[in-house]
Amino acid sequence: MKLLNSISSLGFGVVASMMLTSCASVEAPSPVGPLPSEHQVEWHKMEKYAFVHFGLNTFADKEWGYGDTPASELNPTNLDCEQWVRVAKEAGMQGFIITAKHHDGFCLWPTELTEYCIRNSPYKDGKGDIVGELQAACKKHGLKFGVYLSPWDRNAANYGTPEYLEYYHKQ
């Protein structure tokens, strides 16, 4: 019986030692490869964004634009960019991205770099700026704002040339 008690005490001591040493803190391993920047980590925390595609195809009833729809077809009535942003915020979105220029080449802001833009549409008598209106609404309602600008431009005759790259960067 005395031997059994000694073995039990020894077993308890071994188990207790193992438990205590397994609770010791260990340093994390060094990272391997590139680490995300603080800005990139913050971007990943933004889980929900509205991505809105609105442009000439909305009014031409087309799924795919070729850059040949006249700017005069963009004529939204009662467009309320603040309403879009409010709905996005109510839906839990943290930001709003507008397709400012899709592959058809039409620009939703009054750029001087191309005639194929909102200033040549009847919207607000050519003085409209949907990109600017959305940006202001996002700022007012506390949403982040972004634009999608397609690198492909079916309306630009110089697409695919070094001159086009310069034009694209100026946009």
Write out the residue ranges for each language-model feature.
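Bacterial N-terminal signal peptides that target proteins for export
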Residues: 1-11
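Mature catalytic domains of secreted/periplasmic carbohydrate-active enzymes
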Residues: 25-171
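C-terminal motif of bacterial Sec signal peptides marking the signal peptidase cleavage site
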Residues: 21-22
